[in-house]
C-alpha cells in the first residue's frame, strides 16, 4: 500500500473519532446539566426527566460509536488499498 494513502487513512481515522466525540460530549454535558436543573426545579418530575435523559444520552452516544466504526474501517478494512 502506498505510504501516503496509509498516512491519510490514519489521519482520517483520527479526525473521525475526534470530531465524532467532541459534539456528543458537549451535548451530553449540556443535556445532563439541564436535566439536573429541571429536577431541582420540579423534584416530582424526576422519574420522567431521568428516563428522557437516559434515552437522549444513548442517542448521542450512538453518534460517537458511528465515528469509532468509521475509524476502525479506515484503519483495518482500508477501502483505499
UniProtKB/Swiss-Prot annotation:
InterPro entries given in the database record: ATP_synth_csu_bac/chlpt (IPR005953), ATP_synth_F0_csu (IPR000454), ATP_synth_F0_csu_DDCD_BS (IPR020537), ATP_synth_F0_csu_sf (IPR038662), ATPase_proteolipid_c-like_dom (IPR002379), F/V-ATP_Csub_sf (IPR035921)
Tell me if Transmembrane helix is a UniProt keyword of this record.
Answer: yes
Q: Name one GO cellular component term.
A: proton-transporting ATP synthase complex
Keyword Transmembrane appears in the UniProt entry: yes
The compartments listed are: Cellular thylakoid membrane
**Per UniProt, what is the membrane topology?**
Multi-pass membrane protein
GO molecular function annotation: lipid binding; proton-transporting ATP synthase activity, rotational mechanism
What Pfam families does the annotation carry? ATP-synt_C (PF00137)
Q: Where are the transmembrane segments?
A: 7-27, 57-77
Q: Which SUPFAM superfamilies does the record cross-reference, listed alphabetically? A: F1F0 ATP synthase subunit C
Give UniProt keywords alphabetically: ATP synthesis, CF(0), Hydrogen ion transport, Ion transport, Lipid-binding, Membrane, Thylakoid, Transmembrane, Transmembrane helix, Transport
Q: Where is this site: Reversibly protonated during proton transport?
A: 61
Physiological role: F(1)F(0) ATP synthase produces ATP from ADP in the presence of a proton or sodium gradient. F-type ATPases consist of two structural domains, F(1) containing the extramembraneous catalytic core and F(0) containing the membrane proton channel, linked together by a central stalk and a peripheral stalk. During catalysis, ATP synthesis in the catalytic domain of F(1) is coupled via a rotary mechanism of the central stalk subunits to proton translocation.
Q: How does it assemble?
A: F-type ATPases have 2 components, F(1) - the catalytic core - and F(0) - the membrane proton channel. F(1) has five subunits: alpha(3), beta(3), gamma(1), delta(1), epsilon(1). F(0) has four main subunits: a(1), b(1), b'(1) and c(10-14). The alpha and beta chains form an alternating ring which encloses part of the gamma chain. F(1) is attached to F(0) by a central stalk formed by the gamma and epsilon chains, while a peripheral stalk is formed by the delta, b and b' chains.
Q: Which NCBIfam families does this one have?
A: ATP_synt_c, PRK07354.1
Family per similarity comment: Belongs to the ATPase C chain family.
For this entry, the protein name equals ATP synthase subunit c
Gene name in the database record: atpE
